[in-house]
């Protein structure tokens, strides 16, 4: 029985994704190509860090969570004087790739891929 429990615990730990570090994504949007760098730090299920689009200052991510192979956070910033909320939900695809759905306020929903910088 104890051996079964230990195997279960070990297998669950293997599914916990490591979000820590720098990630990049380049993707097309309604306003043109976007080039992003994300810097993540996870502590248990809590995720903190920054999202930086090329040519703009870093934005602190909010509401960040990592749960197994799932990741989510919010990027709030101002574009041409208008507040914009971008909601990210994603799933790790191996150790070095995250498949994200990015909901940009009521304007767009985008599928993007972030790759770990090694």
What are these regions, as identified by a protein language model?
Residues 1-2, 16-18:
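Absolute protein N-terminus
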Residues 9-17:
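Hydrophobic h-region of N-terminal signal peptides that target proteins for export
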Residues 1-9:
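Sec-dependent signal peptide recognition
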Residues 17-93, 99-118:
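Central antiparallel beta-sheet cores of small beta-barrel/beta-sandwich binding domains
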């Amino acid at each position: 029985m104890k051996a079964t429990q230990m195997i279960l615990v070990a297998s669950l730990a293997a599914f916990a994704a490591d979000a820590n570090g720098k990630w990049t994504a380049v993707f097309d949007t309604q306003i043109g190509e976007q080039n992003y760098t994300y810097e993540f730090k996870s502590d248990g299920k809590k995720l903190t860090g920054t999202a930086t689009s090329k040519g703009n200052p870093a934005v602190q991510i909010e509401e960040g969570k990592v749960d197994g192979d799932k990741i989510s956070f919010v990027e709030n910033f101002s574009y041409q004087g208008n507040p914009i909320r971008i909601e990210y939900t994603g799933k790790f695809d191996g150790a070095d790739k995250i498949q994200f759905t990015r909901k940009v306020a009521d304007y767009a929903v985008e599928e993007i891929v972030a790759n770990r910088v090694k």
